[in-house]
């Protein structure tokens, strides 16, 4: 059993564990995700049909409307939000959404998350301490 610890930059503080859901596509929470169910509803999106509830959602960055921050908040209020989010490079829409929703958010990992993580991996995000752990693989 090996645990890999990766340093990162903290955007929104917190600690969460969960299963990785990778999306190589940028994500617009307004329009791509149903705020009532947490399901990705855009048929052109890489993770179309997937539910982000309780996942460690890994995606390059957000895109789209500033309303996306409030969609993230609505996901949290509806108990269908991701447990944590990991970005290559966070932008203000996702950052604000994570902060107001108390969802841990990190970016700028020391290692490329798309080469180190696989869908279904167990990951701990400790954005308070500035690291992500890939649990026993």
From Swiss-Prot:
Pathway annotation from the record: Isoprenoid biosynthesis; isopentenyl diphosphate biosynthesis via mevalonate pathway
Catalytic reaction equation(s): (R)-5-phosphomevalonate = (2E)-3-methyl-5-phosphooxypent-2-enoate + H2O
InterPro entries in the record: PMDh-S-like (IPR012016), PMDh-S-like_dom (IPR002840), PMDh_S (IPR020794)
UniProt-listed Enzyme Commission number(s): 4.2.1.182
Active site: 65
Gene3D superfamilies: Phosphohistidine domain
Keyword Lyase set for record: yes
Highest rank taxon of the organism: Archaea
A GO molecular-function annotation: hydro-lyase activity
Group of enzyme by EC: lyase
Keywords: Isoprene biosynthesis, Lyase
GO biological process: isopentenyl diphosphate biosynthetic process, mevalonate pathway
Function in brief: Component of a hydro-lyase that catalyzes the dehydration of mevalonate 5-phosphate (MVA5P) to form trans-anhydromevalonate 5-phosphate (tAHMP). Involved in the archaeal mevalonate (MVA) pathway, which provides fundamental precursors for isoprenoid biosynthesis, such as isopentenyl diphosphate (IPP) and dimethylallyl diphosphate (DMAPP).
Protein family: Belongs to the AcnX type II small subunit family.
Subunit structure: Heterodimer composed of a large subunit (PMDh-L) and a small subunit (PMDh-S).
Protein's UniProt name: Phosphomevalonate dehydratase small subunit
The organism of origin for this protein: Methanococcoides burtonii (strain DSM 6242 / NBRC 107633 / OCM 468 / ACE-M)
């Amino acid at each position: 059993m090996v645990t890999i610890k990766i340093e990162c930059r903290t955007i929104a503080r917190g600690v969460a564990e969960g299963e990785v859901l990778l999306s190589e596509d940028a994500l617009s929470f307004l329009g791509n995700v149903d705020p009532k169910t947490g399901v990705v509803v855009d048929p052109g999106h890489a993770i179309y049909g997937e539910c982000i509830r309780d996942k460690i959602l890994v995606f390059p960055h957000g895109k789209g409307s500033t309303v996306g921050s409030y969609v993230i908040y609505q996901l949290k209020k509806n108990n269908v939000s991701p447990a944590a989010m990991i970005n290559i490079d966070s932008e203000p829409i996702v950052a604000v959404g994570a902060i107001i929703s108390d969802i841990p958010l990190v970016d700028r990992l020391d290692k490329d998350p798309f080469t180190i993580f696989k869908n279904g991996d167990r990951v701990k995000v400790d954005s308070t301490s500035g690291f992500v752990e890939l649990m026993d693989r």
